[in-house]
A protein has these predicted regions:
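Active-site anion-handling motifs in enzyme catalytic cores
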Residues: 1-185
């Protein structure tokens, strides 16, 4: 059985959406017969987490839950990406939004074994730096997609955003088009 460690475990944020994402990541790994040895919480410096580093040494690879972290040359984002300088093991960026980053970021991202983004804007940003990526839905919707596909009747729903103005716009679109509006919480 292959094993990995997870960097940027957002379930420690105590936010419903973050909990769903990490739960879905764990479910996905299990489905692929990959053992999750350890996680490093969001905001905690993985380089100083001795327990995490011990498990990293045992693991076959590293998964980074990038979520909305890799943008605007964020110091925290850069610290996550630096894992490719620390280990020679395969590293995977998943669930990523990527925007407004400098060349120092793209140099690190280009060294990842696989990069999975959650929208085409990020894919286009990476293509500018000749970095291949695959667009997949946000991990929030992993289980929802399966449930939706198993239904006989296909319905459309609109959800909200962390941005209040965008949430209002989404709500108005739903109302105007008689579409069910489902806030994430």
């Amino acid at each position: 059985m292959k094993s990995v460690v997870l960097l940027n475990d957002t379930s420690f944020e105590n936010h419903h959406g973050c909990n769903i994402v990490v739960e879905n990541i764990k479910r996905n790994l299990e489905k692929r017969n990959i053992k999750l040895l350890a996680t490093n919480p969001i905001g905690k410096d993985w380089k100083k987490n001795k327990s995490f580093l011990n498990f990293l040494n045992e693991a076959d690879g590293v998964v980074i839950n990038a979520e909305g972290t890799i943008h605007d040359d964020s110091e925290y984002a850069y610290s996550l990406l630096e894992i490719v300088n620390y280990t020679n093991k395969p590293c995977f960026l998943i669930n990523m939004t990527y925007q407004n980053n400098s060349e120092k970021f793209s140099k690190l991202v280009s060294r990842f074994s696989k990069v999975y983004v959650r929208e085409t804007f990020s894919k286009k940003e990476l293509e500018k730096d000749n970095i291949e990526s695959v667009v997949v839905p946000d991990m929030t919707f992993y289980k929802l997609k399966k449930d939706y596909l198993e239904r006989e009747k296909k319905e459309v729903y609109i959800t909200d955003s962390h941005d209040i103005k965008k949430s209002e716009q989404l709500y108005n679109i739903a109302k105007k088009n008689e579409i069910v509006f489902l806030p994430i919480i």
